[in-house]
């Protein structure tokens, strides 16, 4: 038995129905939140794959630094004019993994070489400025890379890989 006046105004029963439904929705969302949020990667996982920025200004000509990105060592070399000229004078066809120096550096920033510092033979960490080619020398099995990170001698099958990177400014790069 409803009258016209009670249909326009909500009853106490309507209020309790809406309040109970809202409380159940909030409680259900609060109960489900931990299950949904645990599917997201944690902060260390996100940070491990995140791009990193490296300031190049403290690296003197002829020096290298090693940084880590995604758990891998990255060598950043500030090459001298002599190293660049020697790398470009190499007959690319004579290399085990033919690749020109120009293909391994960014145009306009030829003095900077950025490579992943893991030997392509068995995964050892090469030493910078060692070996016969003033590049990288793998102490495990003797692979020798030139100043452009190209394999020149030894059992390694390929050049040191170049990670994805870009110049943010003249003195800063972003790796990743």
Swiss-Prot record:
InterPro entries: Rieske_2Fe-2S, Rieske_2Fe-2S_sf, Rieske_Fe-S_prot, Rieske_Fe-S_prot_C, TAT_signal, TAT_signal_bac_arc, Ubiq_cytC_Rdtase_Fe-S_su_TAT, Ubiquinol_cyt_c_Rdtase_Fe-S-su
Residues binding [2Fe-2S] cluster: 119, 121, 138, 141
Cofactor details (free text): Binds 1 [2Fe-2S] cluster per subunit.
Reactions catalysed: a quinol + 2 Fe(III)-[cytochrome c](out) = a quinone + 2 Fe(II)-[cytochrome c](out) + 2 H(+)(out)
Disulfide linkage: 124-140
Keywords, alphabetical: 2Fe-2S, Cell membrane, Disulfide bond, Electron transport, Iron, Iron-sulfur, Membrane, Metal-binding, Translocase, Transmembrane, Transmembrane helix, Transport
Bilayer topology annotation: Single-pass membrane protein
Cofactor(s) required, per the database record: [2Fe-2S] cluster
SUPFAM superfamilies, alphabetized: ISP domain
Gene Ontology, cellular component aspect: plasma membrane; respiratory chain complex III
Keyword Translocase among record annotations: yes
Domain (Rieske) ranges: 87-174
Molecular functions per Gene Ontology: 2 iron, 2 sulfur cluster binding; metal ion binding; oxidoreductase activity; ubiquinol-cytochrome-c reductase activity
Broadest EC class assigned to this enzyme: translocase
EC number, as in UniProt: 7.1.1.8
Transmembrane segment boundaries: 15-36
Entry similarity comment: Belongs to the Rieske iron-sulfur protein family.
Quaternary structure and partners: The main subunits of complex b-c1 are: cytochrome b, cytochrome c1 and the Rieske protein.
Misc: The Rieske protein is a high potential 2Fe-2S protein.
Functional description taken from the UniProt entry: Component of the ubiquinol-cytochrome c reductase complex (complex III or cytochrome b-c1 complex), which is a respiratory chain that generates an electrochemical potential coupled to ATP synthesis.
Protein name, UniProt field: Ubiquinol-cytochrome c reductase iron-sulfur subunit
The species this protein was found in: Bradyrhizobium diazoefficiens (strain JCM 10833 / BCRC 13528 / IAM 13628 / NBRC 14792 / USDA 110)
């Amino acid at each position: 038995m409803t009258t016209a006046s009670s249909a326009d105004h909500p009853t106490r029963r309507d209020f309790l129905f809406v309040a109970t439904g809202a409380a159940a929705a909030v409680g259900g969302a609060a109960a489900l939140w931990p299950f949904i949020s645990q599917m997201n990667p944690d902060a260390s996982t996100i940070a491990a794959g995140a791009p990193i920025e490296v300031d190049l200004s403290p690296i003197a000509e002829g020096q290298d630094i090693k940084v880590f990105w995604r758990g891998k060592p990255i060598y950043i070399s500030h090459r001298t004019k002599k190293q660049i000229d020697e790398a470009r004078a190499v007959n690319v066809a004579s290399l085990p993994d033919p690749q020109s120096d120009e293909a391994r550096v960014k145009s306009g920033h030829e003095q900077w070489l950025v490579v992943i510092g893991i030997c392509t033979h068995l995964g050892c960490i090469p030493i910078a400025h060692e070996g016969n080619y003033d590049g990288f020398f793998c102490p495990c099995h003797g692979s020798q890379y030139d100043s452009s990170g190209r394999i020149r001698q030894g059992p390694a099958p390929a050049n040191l890989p170049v990670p994805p990177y870009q110049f943010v400014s003249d003195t800063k790069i972003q790796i990743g």
